[in-house]
Swiss-Prot record:
Transmembrane segments: none annotated. SUPFAM superfamilies: Nitrite and sulphite reductase 4Fe-4S domain-like, Nitrite/Sulfite reductase N-terminal domain-like. This is Sulfite reductase [NADPH] hemoprotein beta-component. Belongs to the nitrite and sulfite reductase 4Fe-4S domain family. Component of the sulfite reductase complex that catalyzes the 6-electron reduction of sulfite to sulfide. This is one of several activities required for the biosynthesis of L-cysteine from sulfate. Its EC number is 1.8.1.2. The gene is cysI. [4Fe-4S] cluster binds at C438, C444, C484, C488. GO terms for molecular function: 4 iron, 4 sulfur cluster binding; heme binding; metal ion binding; NADP binding; sulfite reductase (ferredoxin) activity; sulfite reductase (NADPH) activity. Binds 1 siroheme per subunit. Siroheme binds at C488.
Length: 575
């Protein structure tokens, strides 16, 4: 099977042996594999090679604690295998009841005792040992949560702008995010059979949209409400830009082909912005979503996974060809895109009042890690708020948490709890609020350098540099750190992006902008944190003295000729 040739009826055909992932998907019996047998094998804490891949479709990654890997090897022990689970939560909305349940599970049944908010607008459990995996899924199911298709070659968790002010518009957009998620979800019964003891969540094993081999590679979708680009549209394969008239949603502009993952040293891989296909009315939304997915399903590269994402398919066959195929499959003709503008993407930390009169408190959670730290019992604090809160919580794509729908009568009480547990801290700088990192060490098997554990102290050093050059609080830099080039920390949409290359070393990228509409380019390769800070000191010194009025750091680096602007990624990024 691994030598079978795949043929694709499209200009610029990809012919070659199938990637081995295609074999295992086809032989998996619709994502079942032999996962159940592996669960019963208590000799090892891990899964076999094929099931290692298949559990991703069920929302899990096999990991181990890399901090103790070498010591366990010396003791002739296998790595401390465990799984990370990412929940499926379109739009990131979770109720207080659900929150208290996941808080309890994290305390009692994970190795790290934390809840990790992620850039995919959901939460992750880390350090779940094999005996607790089925319990985890059944616990989530009991509160109406699952992890179907949050990883693997499928459409993953659908993001939606967390806009607490435009309450009615947000609700409409959120409903569409849920509809899109359900429409593109795998139909196999494998998840229910394996984890829920046969309880049915779906009714058929046919996959009319995803197909028997599912997608060539992971696929990401967003629903976004301008002017906020908090979901970072250009990091995603498919984006629906909400267009409103008189406060009501009338349709979407559709953007296709974004993505940030690359491979070090492979110039055939690159970060890429999404292309604007045009406007569609609401009633064609699901048809267009399915058409984009099935076109990528049929035309995507199944021979080389490094070039398998939608962005490469678009560049290979041409935007016009891909767009025409989507129109044919969806039975729609894209109209000219409606005007919109992105002005920023950071969360509005603090209180905001919606047009419905309810109050919303956005809490800054550094790196999304909810854990009880010395002097800041963040995880306990959120649980205490959940015990009294009458609204819901909204996880953001910036790894923060919004206490949404707060009644005026509860506002003071919730703020008191937030301050008591360190969830509200007036001393947190704007620079820190606009910095984030992926998990990386010790749990991510792909990490080449530290990210989450490196960021806090590094941001302090950057804050000192900004102060040294006399820059006010509002003048900060969108800073992202990711431990490897796969891009979970979205460094390739930052004004200053650091991409892990080796322990203690990073590639330094410059030239993104505040709104997240420009790809940064590599400025320095494989340098240490000390060297990075020296470069930042020099660059910020120039920015402080040479910039024009209100010129952002990323815009300045391009205008000053420090870095060349990336306009067409395939042509410019590695030039």
């Amino acid at each position: 099977m691994s030598k079978q040739v795949i043929e694709q009826e499209v200009l610029g055909q990809v012919l070659g042996p199938l990637a081995d992932n295609e074999r295992l998907k086809r032989e998996s019996k619709n994502l079942r594999g032999t996962i159940e047998q592996d669960l019963e094998d208590r000799i090892t804490g891990g899964f076999t090679a094929d099931n290692f891949q298949l559990i991703r479709f069920h929302g899990m990654y096999q990991q181990d604690d890399r901090d103790i890997r070498n010591e366990r090897t010396k003791q002739k022990l296998e790595p401390l295998h465990n799984v990370m689970l990412r929940a499926r939560m379109p739009g990131g909305i979770i109720t207080p009841k659900q929150w208290l349940a996941i808080d309890k599970f994290a305390d009692e049944s994970t190795s790290y005792g934390s809840i990790r908010l992620t850039t995919r607008q959901t939460f992750q459990f880390h350090g779940v040992l094999k005996p607790n995996i089925k319990l985890m899924h059944q616990t989530l199911n009991s509160i109406g949560i699952d992890s179907i298709a949050t990883a693997g070659d499928v459409n993953r968790n659908v993001l939606c702008t967390t806009n607490p002010v435009e309450s009615e518009l947000h609700q409409e957009a959120y409903e569409w995010a849920k509809k899109i998620s359900e429409h593109l979800l795998p139909k196999t019964r494998a998840y229910a059979e394996i984890w829920l003891d046969g309880e049915k969540l779906a009714t058929t094993d046919e996959e009319p949209i995803l197909g028997s081999n599912y997608l060539p590679r992971k696929f990401k979708t967003t629903v976004v409400i301008p002017p906020q680009n908090d979901v970072d549209v250009h990091a995603n394969d498919l984006n629906f830009i909400a267009i409103a008239k008189d406060g009501k949603l009338v349709g979407f502009n559709v953007l296709v082909g974004g993505g940030l993952a690359m491979t070090h040293g492979d110039t055939s891989t690159y970060a890429r912005k999404a292309d604007d296909f045009g406007f569609v009315p609401l009633e064609k939304t699901l048809d267009v979503a399915a058409a984009v997915v099935t076109t990528q399903r049929d035309w995507g590269n199944r021979s080389n996974r490094k070039n398998a994402k939608t962005k490469y398919t678009l560049d290979r066959v041409g935007i016009d060809v891909f767009k025409a195929e989507v129109e044919k499959r969806a039975g729609v003709e894209f109209a000219e895109s409606r005007p919109y503008e992105f002005t920023g993407r950071g969360d509005r930390i603090g209180w905001a009042e919606g047009i419905d009169g309810k109050h919303h408190l956005a809490l800054f959670i550094e790196n999304g890690r909810l854990l009880d730290f010395p002097g800041k019992a963040l995880k306990t604090g959120v649980a205490e708020i959940a015990k009294i809160h009458k609204g819901d919580f909204r996880m953001t794509a910036n790894q923060n948490l919004i206490v949404a729908g707060v009644l005026k009568s509860q506002k003071a009480q919730i703020e008191k709890l937030a301050r008591q547990y360190g969830l509200m801290d007036d001393a947190v700088s704007e620079q820190r609020k606009n910095s984030m990192a992926c998990v990386a060490f010790p749990t991510c098997p792909l990490a080449m350098a530290e990210a989450e554990r490196f960021l806090p102290e590094f941001v302090t050093d950057v804050e000192d540099i900004l102060k040294k050059h006399g820059l006010p609080e509002e003048d900060n830099i969108i800073l992202r750190i990711t431990g490897c080039p796969n891009g979970c920390g979205r460094a390739m949409l930052a004004e200053l992006g650091l991409v892990g290359k080796a322990p203690g070393r990073y590639n330094m990228h410059l030239g993104g902008n505040k709104a997240g509409t420009r790809i940064p380019k590599m400025y320095k390769e494989n340098i240490t944190s000390a060297q990075i800070l020296e470069e930042i000191d020099s660059l910020v010194g120039r920015w402080a003295t040479e910039r024009t009025d209100n010129e952002g750091f990323g815009d300045f680096t391009i205008r000053a000729g420090i870095i060349e602007e990336v306009i067409i990624s395939k042509r410019d990024l590695h030039a």
